Amino acid sequence: MIQRSAYALAVGILGAFVVWAAPSKAEPWPQRTVRVIVPLPPGVPTDLVCRLFAERLSEPWRQPVAVENRQGADGIPAVSGFVSARDDHTLLCSFPGVITINPLIYEKLPYDPRRDLVPVVSLSDNFIGIAVSAALKVNSLDDFVKLARSQPGKLNWAASPGNPLYGFAALLKSAGIEMVQVSYRDFRPALQDVGEGRIQAVATGVGVLLAQVQAGKVKLLMVHNPQRSPQAPEVPTATEAGYPELTLEGLTGFYGWRDMPADIKARIAADARAVAADPAVVERVASIGSVLRVGTPAEFAAAIEEQRAKIVAIARTIKPTQ
C-alpha cells in the first residue's frame, strides 16, 4: 500500500513536470512595436516608400511601426545598428548598395553582407536618372556625350551614393569621356548647383530631380531602369539611349536578421503584397518617382544577387570616388 502510494505520487510529480516543461505554442508575430531602420535622411524616395509601407503595415500587424533614420557613411551605421539588434521586431528598409556596393569599397565592414542581411521583400524600384544643367543646351544623352568629348576634363559631375554613382562612372567608361567628379557630404546642394550651372551633370533619383526638371533648370537625359519612369515618360531608358550595360534598378526593400524564422519573412512579404494592391499606394509610390515591385523573399534575394553581379562587373572597370 505504501509502495503503491509512493508510485502514484512519483507519477503525479513527473506528469506535472512534463506539463510544465512542454514548450508553449509560438506567439503570433509581432508582439510589440516593429522598428524600421532606414539608412537615408527623411524625405528621399527610399525613406518615403519605407514610411508609406510602415504606416500601412501597422494595421494588419496591430502594432506600431516606428521608422528610424540613421543616415550617412553609405548606410554602415544603420546596418550596424540593425545587425546588433538581433531581433525579429527590427527590420532594415534599404537600397541594395549595403550588400552590393559596400563590400567593394570598404576593405572591412562591421557586418557580413551575405549572412547578416536577409532579403525579406522588395517594395519598389526607385527610378535613377542622369540629368544635366539646362545651360548646356543639350537635348539627348548623345548630345551630352559629344559635348563632353569635345571638352575633356572641363565638365563636372556629381552623384548620390550607391547605384547612381556607379551608373554615372560606368557611363564615363562606356562613352570614353573624361569629367571631374565633385563630392558632396549632403547631396542636396548638388541639385541646386546643377540647376544654377555650377556643375554640369548629376546622377540621382528621378523623384528628387522632378522639381528642377519642371522648372526648366535641368534636363533629364536617361533613366537607368529597365522601364521608363511614369513621371517622365518621354525620357529614354539606358537601353533605348544606346547603353544597355548601364541598366540598373533602385530597389528598396525590407531585410531581416539572419535568424529570422521563415514564417515571419513570409508573413511580412504577404502583408506587403496586400498593401501594394491598394490603388492609393500605387498612386503615392508613383508620385515619389518609383514603381511598386513587391514579391516573395526568394524573388527579392534573386534580384539582389543579379544586381550584385552587375555592380561587380562595373567595378572591375571603374574606380569612382565616394
Question: Residue ranges of each PLM-predicted region?
Answer:
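Bacterial N-terminal signal peptides that target proteins for export
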Residues: 1-11
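N-terminal signal peptide c-region/cleavage motif recognized by signal peptidases
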Residues: 19-23
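N-terminal (or domain-start) structured segment
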Residues: 25-115, 152-154, 163-164, 176-201, ...
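An extracytoplasmic/periplasmic, membrane-proximal ligand-sensing/linker region
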Residues: 31-33, 174, 262-322
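Hinge/capping helix and adjacent helix->loop/strand transition within the periplasmic-binding protein
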Residues: 84-90, 104-189, 238-240, 251-284
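Short beta-strand and adjacent tight-turn residues that come in two discontinuous sequence segments
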Residues: 92-94, 122, 184, 203-205, ...
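A ligand-binding cleft/hinge motif common to bilobed small-molecule-binding domains
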Residues: 97-108, 165, 169-174, 201-235, ...
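C-terminal lobe and pocket-closing loops
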Residues: 209-277, 306-309
